[in-house]
Amino acid sequence: MKNLLLGLCISLIGFSSLATAKITYLSCPYLDERAPDLIVVLDQNNGSASLQSPSMGSGLNFTAPAAFGPSEVTWRKDSKKYKQTYSVDRATLVLKRTTYSEMSNTTHSEVSDCKISKPPKQNKF
């Protein structure tokens, strides 16, 4: 009976940890001077990363599948003209965007220091 109860407790603890959402909000205001309100949302449970900037329009507002590695989180956004790779270093919280242009065969990188921020309090869900 004790083993059954112990097993049930361990199972419940495991299920409760799975139910906890692993969403991290990062404020990264220095990646693009036109987007000082840039928020990066890393959703580990769904395996996605979102960039949200109300002031920027559609250029920096997107969600993409992300890889959550032990030292960094990476994702990409490709268009006809550009291939962009984003990464966040888990230790330093530095966001890096590397853009490759097929037309000019050049690569350009930008970085921004980020801070962990809280989700907006007015959100109901």
Task: Please describe what each predicted stretch is.
Residues 23-48, 78-90:
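Short, solvent-exposed loop/hinge segments that bridge or flank secondary-structure elements
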Residues 20-27, 47-50, 67-76, 92-96:
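Short, hydrophobic/aromatic-rich segments at coil-to-beta transitions
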Residues 56-88:
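Contiguous, well-ordered beta-strand patches that form the walls/edges
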Residues 1-7:
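Positively charged n-region of N-terminal signal peptides that target proteins for export
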Residues 14-18:
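N-terminal signal peptide c-region/cleavage motif recognized by signal peptidases
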Residues 104-125:
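Edge beta-strand at a domain terminus
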Residues 40-61, 94-106:
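N-terminal glycine/threonine-rich, aromatic-flanked beta-hairpin/loop signature
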